[in-house]
């Protein structure tokens, strides 16, 4: 029974989709004024892993993730570069697709742009005005937060406290136009030189929150299963989406709210931010880090937990991924001399590991326990491959199962590659270092990795030599 942690109720709940066998989910995408940073990647990878697990369990998933392609950041960056907002958006949407493809993130079913839905946004805002949930002021339109009785519920915040905080942080000019400091913009009147669209309230552009309400309900309906995003979006963004959408439809907007944790940088666990100078883009990281390593590192931490981005943690992820690859290669190597047939006992052990894996992942996508079962299966495969007599059917079964479980994390096994002399020597040097540090497990893994690719090591008093298998 699959359970998810619902931010709205602050507890794990049994997942029951609106339509049996179908999951409709919306995840807030990036504002496309720059390359995505690792915080954006963390969210994209976390929810891609969740999506993949739903698909592994047999669900049909409709996955919608938007591009915010008009807002203050977009306008400021476009003006700085002397280009149009659409030109800026096109450039970084293309960059987003390139980065996410490198990380093996499945394309969304739909990737809507806010600017593709301006007419719907205007109609949505007008409906809120007609229902007295919104009011126009000098070309802007604001939402009456106090009129929505559940405002603040998602973040478990009190409206009175929010009003006090908003009055302290809102600029005087904007506060003077609002009925209440906590009211928020649905439509922003155009300033000179800004991109804008005509509306009943004058030329302007949509507010950030209304964009997601319109796009999510357009593609998934007035009520859908899952809404996801980073925990920094709980308030005000997701709370405002709820207020807008439920005021318009009178229906529950979303059944399950899922939020991923932050990324911290370095050994000091600093939260990533531009002001601290530790802002890191995926575009830059992938110049020096293998995409599969970054993907594996980020997808094997439970989505609600923070991730500590350090070189040491990346190195650990790389080693763990190499161990899994080595096990996969070892079994592939033994297929050459395997006998026809199956080993029912070993295959039953494999099925039990899969059952345990599902139990782990059904518990709010507990990837730490899930990946532990993947490693357990790899060990089973390694041990079986060392037997004098092995059966091809069983080797194939374990290898395919290992591949299937790991694919949930967005990882693909590499085909056995031809090693050049430099790579062989690098692995021999790594094996020597492992033996000196008494890491005999890693030493043996390297020997088996090379053996699986036809390279035989011979330890002599003069050092380690290698030869190609005849």
UniProtKB/Swiss-Prot annotation:
- Where along this sequence does the record place binding of ATP? 274
E.C. designation(s): 6.1.1.16
As for subcellular location, the record says: Cytoplasm
Sequence positions that bind Zn(2+): 28, 212, 237, 241
Q: Which cofactor does the UniProt annotation name?
A: Zn(2+)
Query: What's a GO biological-process term for it?
Result: cysteinyl-tRNA aminoacylation
Family assignment from sequence similarity: Belongs to the class-I aminoacyl-tRNA synthetase family.
Protein name (database record): Cysteine--tRNA ligase
Organism the protein comes from: Levilactobacillus brevis (strain ATCC 367 / BCRC 12310 / CIP 105137 / JCM 1170 / LMG 11437 / NCIMB 947 / NCTC 947)
Q: Which gene encodes it?
A: cysS
